[in-house]
Structures are given as C-alpha cells and as structure tokens.
Regions:
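Buried hydrophobic positions in well-ordered alpha/beta secondary-structure cores of metabolic enzymes
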Residues: 29, 120, 171-172, 209, ...
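Active-site C-terminal subdomain of aminotransferase-like
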Residues: 267-356
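Conserved active-site segment immediately N-terminal to the catalytic lysine
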Residues: 29, 253-270
Length: 359
C-alpha cells in the first residue's frame, strides 16, 4: 500500500466484489463506454501549486470579468467589509444570535448590545433603541404594528410608494394577519407626495405613516411638513433609513419622526444570498413601552460598579404572552455586533466619508 494516503481496496476485496456482481474484471464495468472515450495511461496533470500560486491564478481568472457599475441593490449592497470584523465576530464568546436568558451572567454580550443601541440612537437621533430585529423589512412591519398599538382606535397605516418593494411586501403580510388596513401614497417628481398625504390624513383614521429617507429610486426625500401634518392628525411618523447615509443627511429625529427603522446591512455586512442581516429601531421615549424586542439597560451592581441588564421585560411575549407588543424575542445579535464593530472602526469621520461617497 506504499504511495497511498488512504487505505485502498485490496486485490481480494476487488475480486470478491467482481464475483458478487458476475464481472470478470474491472474493465468489464465500462463495456458500454465506446473505446475511443476510454482513457489509457496516467493523466497529464501539472504539479500541485502552492496556496499563493492558486490565489494568483484564481485572481487572474477573476480579472477577466468585466466590472460594471452596479445600480441594483434595493436594500442589499456590496459595501467594503474590513477584514478585522469577521475575525472579531467569529470569536467563540460572540458567536450567537441570541440575547441571553441568564442575562446578568453575560455582561460582555449585554454590553455590546447596549453599545449597538447607543450607536443606533446616535445615528437616528432617537431616545431609545432595542437589541435589534430580524431585518429592515421586519423592523418596518413591527413599526407599523407599533403605530396601531399607540393609536388604539385607529388601524390604517399609510405607506410611501417610494419604499423598497420587499419592505412593502413584508409590511403587507403583517398587516393582513393583524387586521391593519394599508393605504399607499403616490410619488410626485420622485418624492412622496405631501399633498396626497394631507388628503389621506383628513379621513381621521390613520395611525401611522411610513416613508423612506432615501427612496427606491435612490433619491433623498424632502419630508418638510410631513411631521406637522402627521402629528396634527394624531398619528405617528416612521422614517425608513439607510444607516450608512445618516452621518451626512438629516436624521429621522430632525425630520420630526417618532420611530426610525432600517436595515443594518450597509454597515459592513456582506451579501450572502439575502441574509442574515439585522433590523434596527429607534423611538422617542414616549413610545418605548410599545417598542418590540429586547432592551438592554445600564445600572449599577451592589458594589456600585456599572452593570447591564435586560429591562422593561414586562412588555415582552415571554411574560405578557398574547398581549405582548410583539413576538420578537430572539434577534440578530451577532449581526448587531457586526454593525457595532464596523461603526467603532469607522468612527464619526469615517462614517461621514462613507456617507458622502454613497449620496
């Protein structure tokens, strides 16, 4: 068996198998293959290449592809991911999608979730954020439910036609099974129509309005007057935003929004056939008890040291059951960490440079 890196069949093994199937020799197994297609003798394969040589060869092949400007995306973008991020987030102590059940024991996990929440609030200008949601569309759908929960007796929500199509589809699915009626605001010269919004609000049955900061056409929307009109109708304004642009454009809070949602994928999360991504949500403090998902809060332990806990849990489904604000519990904690590391590495000036490049 010299020369083999594995244990091959012995001649006796081969003979026993051939006898079992009634074949005289191995070549008889290929009797149906035309002789001109049978290979005789060894293959003329080149010597094995080293890893750097293989990489260089593959890169040369890839270099033959034509590189075009990509205008596709619709919420999933091929942004640069610093190589240190996968290294940090793949560490065994971080590698989980869950917020912990024995939360006080997992201070490291709670700390980075708290930092994620803090960064979301800094980007959006909101007062409080949660530990994350499944993705941007889910965050928008949860915001839709939240506006209805806050309005109590109103169950109609208006969606801008400038929202990304898959966001609208998920919101429609949630609305169908929660008894929420949806209305759609038309576009006027690439912007959500304020005139149409005002007309829809006049009916007095609108609980919330969801509009994009950057719409499906790639245009930055001007939402001047939106918050005033929505609040005058005693409804809530939800801004769906791209976090990579928030360092250079108006934040949802500056537009007067009550809720800010979006997808964290632009914050260095690579494309991978649609996921996993991470949704984020920030709200004004008046509405924090209606916000879905888990919330990490900061406190002090018995020795006076800073500590982190899961707070406001009475609103969650493991306590309130069917009366909970949402069924969201487990989340995209690992992807939230990914965004946190990305934002920490880029810093304020780095995010401004990225924002200017994007818009």
């Amino acid at each position: 068996m010299a020369g083999f890196s594995y244990f091959p069949h012995t001649d006796a093994d081969v003979r026993a198998m051939l006898d079992r199937i009634g074949a005289g020799k191995v070549e008889d197994l290929y009797a149906d293959v035309p002789k001109e297609f049978l290979k005789k003798g060894p293959y003329a394969l080149p010597d094995a290449m080293s890893e750097p040589e293989v990489r260089a060869w593959l890169n040369a092949l890839a270099g033959m592809n034509a590189k075009m400007k990509v205008f596709a995306g619709a919420g999933a973008y091929d942004h640069y991911t610093p190589s240190v991020i996968p290294y940090i987030t793949s560490r065994s102590e971080f590698l989980t999608a869950y917020t912990p059940y024995q939360c006080e024991i997992s201070q490291g996990t709670l700390r980075y979730i708290f930092e994620f929440q803090s960064m979301v609030c800094e980007l959006t200008g909101m007062d409080i954020s949660n530990a994350s949601l499944y993705d941007g569309p889910t965050a928008a759908a949860e915001a839709m439910k939240m506006t209805v929960a806050c309005a109590k007796k109103k169950n109609r929500v208006l969606l801008s036609s400038g929202l990304l199509p898959h966001v609208v589809k998920v919101v429609e699915t949630y609305a169908k099974f929660h008894g929420v009626t949806l209305g759609y605001l038309p576009m006027a010269e690439g912007q959500t129509s304020l005139e149409a919004l005002t007309a829809e609000l006049a009916a007095g049955d609108v609980a919330g309005v969801i509009g994009p900061e950057i719409n499906r056409f790639g245009l930055i929307e001007n939402h001047t007057g939106f918050a005033d009109a929505v609040h005058a109708a005693k409804a809530l304004l939800v801004e769906y935003c791209d976090p990579s642009a928030l360092a250079v454009i108006k934040s949802p809070a500056e537009w007067g929004a009550d809720i800010a949602v979006g997808d964290g994928q632009p914050l260095g999360i690579p494309l991978c056939f649609g996921g996993p991504y991470v949704g984020f949500m920030g709200v004004k403090k008046d509405y924090m008890r209606k916000m879905p998902g888990r919330i990490v809060g900061q406190t002090t332990d018995k020795d006076g040291k800073r500590a982190f806990v899961l707070t406001l849990q009475a609103r969650e489904q493991h306590i309130k059951r069917e009366k909970a604000t949402s069924n969201i519990c487990s989340n995209e904690s690992l992807m939230a960490l990914w965004c946190t590391v990305y934002l920490s590495l880029m810093g304020p000036e780095g995010m401004r440079k990225i924002g200017r490049a994007h818009v």
